[in-house]
Swiss-Prot record:
Mg(2+) binds at residues 40, 113, 116. It holds the Pfam family dsrm. Residues 5-127 form the RNase III domain. GO terms for cellular component: cytoplasm. Digests double-stranded RNA. Involved in the processing of primary rRNA transcript to yield the immediate precursors to the large and small rRNAs (23S and 16S). Processes some mRNAs, and tRNAs when they are encoded in the rRNA operon. Processes pre-crRNA and tracrRNA of type II CRISPR loci if present in the organism. The keyword rRNA processing applies. This is Ribonuclease 3. NCBIfam families: RNaseIII. Residues 154-224 form the DRBM domain. It is found in: Cytoplasm. It comes from the Bacteria. The keyword rRNA processing applies. It comes from Xanthomonas oryzae pv. oryzae (strain KACC10331 / KXO85). Keywords: Cytoplasm, Endonuclease, Hydrolase, Magnesium, Metal-binding, mRNA processing, Nuclease, RNA-binding, rRNA processing, rRNA-binding, tRNA processing. The lineage of its organism: Bacteria, Pseudomonadati, Pseudomonadota, Gammaproteobacteria, Lysobacterales.
Amino acid sequence: MSNRIFQRGDPIGHAFADPDLLAQALRHRSAGTPHNERLEFLGDGIVNLLVAEALYQRWPKADEGALTRARAELVREGALAVIGRTLNLGERLTLGPGELKSGGHRRDSILADAVEAIVAAIYLDCGFERCRAVVLPWFEASLAALPVGKAEKDPKTRLQEWLQARQLPLPNYALISESGDEHAKQFHVACILEQPVARAEGQGTSRRLAEQQAATLVIAQLDSRM
């Protein structure tokens, strides 16, 4: 994969003063040292703090349980992998030959780890305030699609309940493609609504995860129209 430096205008939203931090954040353990595992450790804590702070401020009446469930939904592996794809991290990862051959640049776990490592790299490059300003927009669509009191429900369930409450047709989930070896499958699914008209596509290491991602994006579309 190409390990080109992010420039202004890239989806990440930050130009690195220290490009070595970016290079390390994008280097998987399979490619040798220095790899991104220590940055991943630091980034995990920063992501949890940023998301927890955002939820605390946006949901002033939510109890601890609702906040905890919401944070878990937003920082889970699949959700972070969606962000990684949005940032085009897969094409920029440095992977060892084995991971390259097995499609590691598409794997949710590797993409999620890379997102956490990038967050840590931004923090070390420019400090917490700038890190918050860059990273929180990555979560905006997911935050908007996660109503208070329904954080324990998955996106497909929330979408179905939203449609049923309005006596509208249920969504259709269509498999667009299935690729990869048995141990590294990648599913591409579309979520299609007849009324109101909406469509979004999701990807994941299982059909269920791909459908959940697509449903999340459809919910974000519906919220933006209100």
